[in-house]
């Protein structure tokens, strides 16, 4: 087992730095069916009070966003279009910033159960989107509020990307200048990136 990420990982880093630094880390969910896991290949940063695309824009505090005001490493789950999306809180208490996990590269030993969880979906479709990866990993709204440090969900050090690309976030139209913030980070060439073009897939993406 690789080194498990602790609270110290989140210290003295910005949300943007964290969104880049967790690329290549292994996201692990321990379930009744066994360990389900994969390498993170795509993230998006959401910068809280000043980010029109963030749920916590202008420090909006609701029952849904309450966990965003807690502490680094806390898990923020929310539903969108019948899908459940996974986010990690990044900043100290009271600063509601987060990272959305958009795609993972599934680990080989976990694929069989993940395919079952995805009702037979295989290949890149297994985990190449934020709602797809949570379904594959068996995550749900019941995971809201857990932490990465004392629950059945955690991060492990695994691989380092050769190159990281920064582009506009997906699905945030009509959010003023925030629509054009380059806050989506991807492992360049990964076939599991959402909406990845075949012509952009590379065979050697890890150091």
From Swiss-Prot:
CDD domains: AAG (cd00540). GO terms for molecular function: alkylbase DNA N-glycosylase activity; DNA binding. Gene3D superfamilies: Methylpurine-DNA glycosylase (MPG). Keywords: DNA damage, DNA repair, Hydrolase. GO terms for biological process: base-excision repair. Its EC number is 3.2.2.-. SUPFAM superfamilies: FMT C-terminal domain-like. Belongs to the DNA glycosylase MPG family. This is Putative 3-methyladenine DNA glycosylase. It comes from Listeria monocytogenes serotype 4b (strain CLIP80459).
